[in-house]
Amino acid sequence: MRVELFPFQKRALADIRMKTAEAMGSYHRTHAPQVVSFTAPTGAGKTIIMSALIEAILFGDEQYMEQPDAIIVWLSDSPQLNEQSKQKIDSKADKIKLSQCVTVSEESFDKEVFEDGHVYFLNTQKLSVTSKLTKNGDGRTYTIWETLANTVREKSDRLYFIIDEAHRGMQGREASKATTIMQKFIKGSDSDGIPPMPVVIGMSATTQRFNALVEGTSSTIHKSIVTTDEVRASGLLKDRIVITYPEEGTVNNDMAILQAAADEWKEKWEH
């Protein structure tokens, strides 16, 4: 990693790495789908922790051997969020090459299986019934559902499916549709011909949101939680922000500084 993780982030990374390895082992012993639930408050740097996890899976660490043929699929509900996550991985995870990160495109993606050693970015809009990815024809050999099902069948020992439930771009009815699509990967979908993903890593800001996502599943759930107190102790979260109202002549300059600081904070820690 190009950045030094905070102590609580290192603890979370070690915990998620252990539980992900346990989940993969359990799946191959029992063939029961596994879910690793990673919950951390907004501002904890969840995407940075997940970037470090992907790097650890692909290149190994002190506890686990490298798995260079691992396949990671990252699902969110927004192409913009996918792009932000992809850029975060590129800028923070120095061992992962940009060429390993692939945005699944409606126009050009058509594969029997996902390729080893890559991180694929999907969003729920591309999985709707109207999406070209979900339909045969127009020169397409494989639908995205067929690609997923084939990969589970042939490469279940190295497939990790990340659901980014923490950063939601959709609201209202569209958010509900996105949740329904996300649940297909946890529960499977007979109508789409896909089984549950072997190992799902769910990233969420609250336990309530994640519980809603996994409601009704039979998957074994492994939980990893970062508390607000841990993040606050690191200095990333503040108890209070004091705002004063200066004389009119100084307002514009001060607000410009405040806006710049807020923009920098958002860029570093929102994802």
What spans do the regions from the language model cover?
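Conserved RecA-like ASCE ATPase "motif II neighborhood" in helicase/translocase motors
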Residues: S105-D110, G117-I162, M170-F185
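Conserved Walker A/P-loop ATP-binding site and its immediately adjacent core
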Residues: I48-A52, Y64-K97, Q125-K126
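Conserved interdomain linker/interface between the two RecA-like ATPase lobes of SF2 helicase motors
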Residues: A212-H271
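N-terminal pre-P-loop "Q-motif" helix
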Residues: V3-A32, N123
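A short beta-strand-to-loop transition that corresponds to the Sensor-1 phosphate-sensing loop
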Residues: S78, L122-K126, E165, M203-T207
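Walker A/P-loop
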Residues: Y27-L53
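Post-DEXD/H (motif II) to motif III coupling segment of the RecA-like Helicase ATP-binding lobe
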Residues: Q171-S234
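Phosphate/oxyanion-binding active-site loops and adjacent basic polyanion-contact surfaces
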Residues: V3-I16, T42-A52, L81-N82, G172-A178, ...
